């Protein structure tokens, strides 16, 4: 069944939202991240998603203490991403109690290391974040969306699915933080070609209709801004996906 996965992006402990990954287009929310996650958990969320934007920019400043506290204080699965660049970082996050680590640009820039991480920690502990943008075809973007690689999304998926990949988090960059609606066609295409891969959809969720459009296609839908802005609640999202 498709799950709603509430998300928080954190910079120096503050809950923020960026538009299309741009640190200059930042909105700060006056929420305590632990209280917010507990609120989402109480509402029925079975998984939570955290992006460490401080660590993404500077790995030496990764918010390990806060991440460990969040992982210990909530009783549901927490997955964490944000510029993970090494096996040591992935291990440190898992040691903090994180259920899944999200690997992004590394999948394109250093496939050997990415495969080592997949092998060492197992396919249930790793989510491949494939941020994509439509050129002539869907290509994967790297470096916090600063540049488009020459790697086609479907080719990357084909490569890793043959190496045991089980979970992906796919973001249509053109949609992220815009609340313009999800790119359901993209996720349907991935699901048709790779039915064994669990897809987490991200970017552009603006209404319950978006959740409806992804029901049965994706294993999870990551929702950040729509929940923070009160467009709909976790309870409403769950009801929509269960009906």
Curated annotation (Swiss-Prot):
Its EC number is 5.3.1.16. The active site is at 9 (proton acceptor), 131 (proton donor). GO terms for molecular function: 1-(5-phosphoribosyl)-5-[(5-phosphoribosylamino)methylideneamino]imidazole-4-carboxamide isomerase activity. It is found in: Cytoplasm. Pfam families: His_biosynth (PF00977). Disulfide bonds: none annotated. It catalyses: 1-(5-phospho-beta-D-ribosyl)-5-[(5-phospho-beta-D-ribosylamino)methylideneamino]imidazole-4-carboxamide = 5-[(5-phospho-1-deoxy-D-ribulos-1-ylimino)methylamino]-1-(5-phospho-beta-D-ribosyl)imidazole-4-carboxamide. One of its GO terms (cellular component) is cytoplasm. One of its GO terms (biological process) is L-histidine biosynthetic process. It comes from the Bacteria. Keywords: Amino-acid biosynthesis, Cytoplasm, Histidine biosynthesis, Isomerase. Pathway: Amino-acid biosynthesis; L-histidine biosynthesis; L-histidine from 5-phospho-alpha-D-ribose 1-diphosphate: step 4/9. The keyword Membrane does not apply. Its main location: cytoplasm. HAMAP family: HisA. Belongs to the HisA/HisF family. This is 1-(5-phosphoribosyl)-5-[(5-phosphoribosylamino)methylideneamino] imidazole-4-carboxamide isomerase. It comes from Campylobacter jejuni (strain RM1221).
């Amino acid at each position: 069944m498709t799950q709603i996965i509430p998300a928080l992006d954190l910079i120096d402990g503050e809950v923020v939202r960026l538009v299309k990954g741009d640190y200059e287009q930042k909105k700060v929310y006056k929420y305590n991240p632990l209280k917010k996650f507990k609120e989402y958990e109480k509402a029925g969320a079975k998984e939570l998603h955290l992006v460490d934007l401080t660590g993404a920019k500077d790995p030496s400043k990764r918010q390990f203490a806060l991440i460990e506290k969040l992982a210990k204080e909530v009783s549901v699965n927490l997955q964490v991403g944000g510029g993970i660049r090494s096996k040591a970082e992935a291990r440190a996050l898992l040691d903090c109690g994180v259920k899944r680590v999200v690997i992004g640009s590394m999948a394109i820039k250093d496939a050997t290391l990415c495969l080592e991480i997949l092998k060492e920690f197992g396919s249930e502990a790793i989510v491949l974040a494939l941020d994509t943008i439509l050129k002539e075809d869907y290509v994967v973007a790297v470096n916090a969306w600063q540049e488009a690689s020459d790697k086609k999304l479907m080719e990357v998926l084909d490569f890793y699915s043959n190496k045991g990949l089980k979970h992906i988090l796919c973001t249509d960059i053109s949609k992220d933080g815009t609340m313009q609606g999800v790119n359901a066609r993209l996720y349907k295409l991935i699901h048709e070609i790779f039915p064994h891969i669990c897809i987490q959809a991200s970017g552009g969720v603006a209404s319950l209709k978006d959740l409806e459009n992804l029901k049965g296609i994706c294993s999870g839908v990551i929702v950040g801004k729509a929940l923070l802005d009160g467009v709909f609640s976790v309870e409403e999202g769950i009801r929509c996906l269960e009906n």
